[in-house]
Amino acid sequence: MEPSPALAWLLLLSLVADCLKAAQSRDFTVKDIIYLHPSTTPYPGGFKCFTCEKAADNYECNRWAPDIYCPRDTRYCYTQHTMEVTGNSISVTKRCVPLEECLSTGCRDSEHEGYKICTSCCEGNICNLPLPRNDTDATFATTSPINQTNGHPHCVSVIVSCLWVWLGLTL
């Protein structure tokens, strides 16, 4: 019995269609990011962010983002997402920023009717992969305390005073 050429063509077309579906994925995964993360940095604590200015959507931003380290005077990755009320992206901006630019995260309605702007910041290497789409996503996520001081002089004086009183009472 001879195999049918029609069946062979059907199987071949099915295989090609599956390959095309896989090739048109429009989102990055964490595995993709692993390949972008080198083992050395140009300075201690060096990090990267996805960077783009007014890209059409998240895919276009992340796809063409330059693979460079953020300047030393920055500490966070910033993302601003402008979208229609339906959720369709209008504009995506991502960059490295200092703390001051991360103090107003959240979502707000734009002056243009029907637009919503959500802003988020994060701390970490290439942490700004996803887009903020609502108040739950539009946050300021840090891995370390924002207000880091070199010490607490008031606490030290209280401890010393307590020790002085304790030593004075036990003598």
From Swiss-Prot:
Disulfide bonds join 49-77, 52-61, 70-96, 102-121, 107-118, 122-127. One of its GO terms (biological process) is positive regulation of canonical Wnt signaling pathway. Glycans are attached at residues 134, 147. Interacts with nicotinic acetylcholine receptors (nAChRs) including CHRNA3, CHRNA4, CHRNA5, CHRNA6, CHRNA7, CHRNB2 and CHRNB4. Interacts (via NxI motif) with LRP6. Residues 47-141 form the UPAR/Ly6 domain. It is found in: Secreted; Cytoplasm; Cell membrane; Synapse, Synaptosome. A lipid is attached at residue 147 (GPI-anchor amidated asparagine). This is Ly6/PLAUR domain-containing protein 6. It holds the Pfam family UPAR_LY6_2. Acts as a modulator of nicotinic acetylcholine receptors (nAChRs) function in the brain. Inhibits nicotine-induced Ca(2+) influx through nAChRs. In vitro, specifically inhibits alpha-3:beta-4 and alpha-7 nAChR currents in an allosteric manner. Acts as a positive regulator of Wnt/beta-catenin signaling.
